[in-house]
């Protein structure tokens, strides 16, 4: 039901495009996590790779790099690590990551404190693992998946690959504040500090 020609542009570029009605019957909810959850439901390969749509620095080989660590059978999640550009400078981006996600993860999940880009949108999951996890509705989805994989499989099941410098649209603070609130809520919820956040249930057993 795209109104901005996203589906048509993707199909023209050679992507397989499926309507949500053909994947799951539930009425779609707004939010990034909803799209990723449905993507997992539609996937048929052993590995599912996610790449943010506003990425301006995608390079050939990026998807391959994200999947290579899965030669180790213990690896369940692969996160990209990179430098975040900001206003023309090679570093300084990722403000929600640096000011919200990382401090909270170090406080409540110190075993994840070394993860370079906990909120990064470029990552890969084993499909069987993804189907066993809930997906937070909105921008907290990456934090939720990171914590859930670590709790189920251990932090050693999370690998990182260096993808250089990431360039994408830098949002104004007025847009980042709600994102930071959702990310903080997800981490605090997983830590048992506050109640549950809105999320889709695991797909295992549903399809």
Roles of regions detected by a PLM:
Residues 45, 73-76, 155:
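Short, high-confidence coil segments that cap the C-terminus of an alpha-helix
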Residues 1-8:
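A conserved acidic beta->alpha catalytic loop
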Residues 26-38, 58-129:
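Acceptor/aglycone-binding surface of glycosyltransferases and processive sugar-polymer synthases
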Residues 12-14, 44:
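Short, structured coil segments at secondary-structure junctions
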Residues 92-186:
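Conserved catalytic loops of nucleotide-sugar-dependent glycosyltransferases that act on lipid-linked
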Residues 171-207:
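Terminal low-complexity segments of carbohydrate-biosynthetic enzymes
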Residues 48:
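Short aromatic/hydrophobic "clamp" motif used to bind/position activated sugar donors
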Residues 51-54:
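Active-site acidic Asp-centered loop
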